[in-house]
Amino acid sequence: MPMNRRTFLGKSCASLGALAILDAAALRAQSAAEEGSMADWTGRHLNEGNWSADAIFLSAIKFLKQPEDIVRVSMPFGGGMGQKDLCGYLTGGFMAIGLFAGPKKASDNAARKKCSQLAKEYYDWWTKNYPLHCGEINKSQTEPCDYKLMGQKTAAFLQALFERESNKG
């Protein structure tokens, strides 16, 4: 059955509108499935096989609603850069702070200063709670380290930091 242009465009727009509504409903359902805290997400990411740096950074990416594929930059930092060196939770947290507060332009000195302040606050918190290097973590404790709990505590600290700074607005 032949259709004139106006009828065709009307039906096309109606179909696209219905698809947009269905897509929005799917997006809301996906968001509901992703609800939770950075600590919850970090635990899930660890259970899925992620290492420290990518687990903490991926949780921050989700919290900050950024594209998840950027997590790839954190992969080499897990396991203390694969050498039991600087802990991946520490380095992943620094990447998360950069994503949250880092300057979008090199000339943004205010953002650079804020990012540095948050990084210092995180570093100070970290060094009060954990050694810097993965190889020292079990040696410094009387009981074996619970890496998942350590990651969740780190994620909770970062989320509180992000929420506090976001509320300053």
Annotate each language-model stretch with its function:
Residues 40-47, 76-85, 139-143:
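A short glycine/serine-rich beta->alpha loop
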Residues 24-45:
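C-terminal segment of N-terminal export signals and the immediately downstream linker at the start
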Residues 100-126:
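Mid-chain, well-packed structural core segment of small domains
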Residues 50-98:
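Small-residue-enriched, tightly packed secondary-structure blocks
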Residues 37, 51, 55, 68, ...:
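Conserved active-site and cofactor/substrate-binding residues in soluble primary-metabolism enzymes
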Residues 116-169:
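C-terminal binding/interaction regions
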Residues 1-17:
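N-terminal secretory signal peptides and thylakoid transit peptides that target proteins
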